[in-house]
């Protein structure tokens, strides 16, 4: 599964997603999370007293892979039982809500999601740069 809003996917990532899915039945592109996450206080949304250690976090994106039969059965169950599909069609969260263990595959920081003007500027910089510099 891949979305067209991430056009800079490379062969190494695709190969690892396929390999991990062949071994375990699914694969989710991921990277370590390098920012700090703080939990908003219930008393005051402009404050915090709690953080989530970044070592416990992974950033996930597309591509992702699932064995077709398992994915089809999961969607049928999710719609039938209204599980994991509340306002979202994101496959990974649905699968976790259904109790599935997800397996991480290699990701890439260059696999950016084009949603803002800044993303487009970064995309333009990547595609106008020398391919040997960044397409590795």
Language-model segments: residues:
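Short beta-strand-to-loop acidic/aromatic patch adjacent to the donor-nucleotide binding site
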Residues: 1-5
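Short, small-residue-enriched loops and turns at beta-alpha junctions
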Residues: 6-8, 112-113
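Short linear loop/turn motifs
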Residues: 90-91, 109-113
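Glycine-rich phosphate/pyrophosphate-binding loop and the adjoining helix
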Residues: 101, 108, 125
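Conserved core of the sugar-phosphate nucleotidyltransferase
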Residues: 8-105, 136
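Glycine-rich beta-alpha junction loops
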Residues: 32-35, 109-110, 118
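Hydrophobic helical membrane-anchoring modules
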Residues: 111-136
């Amino acid at each position: 599964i891949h979305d067209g809003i991430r056009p800079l996917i490379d062969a190494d990532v695709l190969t690892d997603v396929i390999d991990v899915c062949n071994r375990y039945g699914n694969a989710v592109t991921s990277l370590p999370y390098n920012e700090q996450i703080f939990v908003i206080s219930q008393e005051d949304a402009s404050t915090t007293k709690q953080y989530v250690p970044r070592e416990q976090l992974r950033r996930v994106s597309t591509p992702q892979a699932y064995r077709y039969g398992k994915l089809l059965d999961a969607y049928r169950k999710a719609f039938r039982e209204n599980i994991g599909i509340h306002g979202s069609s994101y496959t990974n969260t649905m699968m976790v809500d259904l109790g599935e263990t997800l397996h991480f595959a290699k990701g890439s920081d260059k696999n950016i999601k084009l949603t803002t003007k800044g993303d487009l500027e970064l995309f333009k910089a990547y595609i106008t740069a020398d391919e040997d510099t960044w397409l590795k």
